[in-house]
Regions:
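Conserved short strand/loop->alpha-helix "switch" segment adjacent to the catalytic nucleotide/phosphoryl-transfer site
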Residues: 13-31, 85-87, 104-135, 142-153
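Conserved DHp (HisKA) dimerization/phosphotransfer helix of two-component histidine kinases, i.e.
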Residues: 40-44, 57-110
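Acidic ATP/Mg2+-coordinating residue in the GHKL
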Residues: 172
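Conserved phosphoacceptor histidine of two-component systems
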Residues: 24-39, 43, 47
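ATP phosphate-binding glycine-rich loop and adjacent ATP-lid/helix-beta elements
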Residues: 179-207
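Glycine-rich nucleotide-binding loop
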Residues: 165, 176, 209-216
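Short beta-strand/loop element within the Bergerat-fold HATPase_c
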Residues: 151-164
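C-terminal beta-strand of the catalytic ATP-binding
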Residues: 217-222
Length: 222
């Protein structure tokens, strides 16, 4: 029987059969829906905030949006990773840093968020606490660490420690602030940072960075 050109091509071709994509589990589907719901909530809050004239109230709405975004990011990571209830903090902080750079930094003025984060796996609720801490500190740093119109960087660093835990550092190179005053955190944001750090069961401190200020959180083996 004569072989056609198509037959020869089909006979000689190497066909790579890709494994089917994993079916989303019930928890994946829940995380996907939660992330979508939080995105909808964020859009509603954003629409409401556009009509506010009072700068203090507007700032409170903006911070609320960032807190919602930090929580939604955890659920997006859970849905994408198919790792059950565990979140890769490195991937999560990379994404969160980009979102914070877009929302609170000013790249045109030379203000950036730099992230160097190791791929530490943590539980979802732990990642949520870390996200809220980072969002609060980065936002506050761009508000107060640098003079209006001045360039500046806020860095987020995460590394695994020898004892099976991790060390988180959020640092600016700005005007600096009294670590004792920062630790007291009389505003809602400062209180949230303290509450979340305590919830994680680690040791946290505000340090002089010379120049600037550094927040450090060390969490032991989980």
């Amino acid at each position: 029987m004569m072989m056609t050109t198509i037959d020869r091509v089909a006979q000689n071709a190497r066909v790579t059969v890709l494994p089917p994509a994993p079916e989303p589990s019930t928890s994946d589907e829940i995380n996907h829906r939660v992330a979508n719901s939080l995105q909808l909530l964020s859009a509603m809050v954003s629409a409401e905030a556009r009509g506010i004239q009072d700068p203090v109230a507007a700032a409170a709405f903006d911070m609320t949006l960032r807190r919602i975004g930090a929580i939604a990011g955890v659920h997006r990571q859970l849905y994408r990773s198919h790792q059950g209830a565990m979140v890769n903090l490195g991937t999560y902080l990379d994404e969160l840093g980009g979102e914070l750079e877009e929302s609170v930094a000013d790249t045109a003025a030379g203000r950036f968020v730099i992230v160097h984060a190791a791929g530490v796996l943590v539980r979802a609720e732990e990642a949520t606490s870390i996200g809220i801490i980072v969002s609060e500190i980065v936002t506050n740093a761009f508000k107060h660490a640098y003079a209006p119109g001045a360039s500046g960087i806020v860095s987020i660093a995460l590394r695994a420690t020898a004892r099976g835990g991790y060390l988180l550092e959020v640092k600016d190179c700005g005007q600096g602030r009294d670590p004792d005053q920062a630790a007291r955190g009389t505003g809602l944001g400062g209180r949230l940072v303290g509450m979340m750090a305590t919830k994680l069961g680690g040791h946290h401190a505000w340090l002089h960075a010379n120049p600037g200020t550094c927040f450090e959180l060390c969490v032991g083996k989980r």
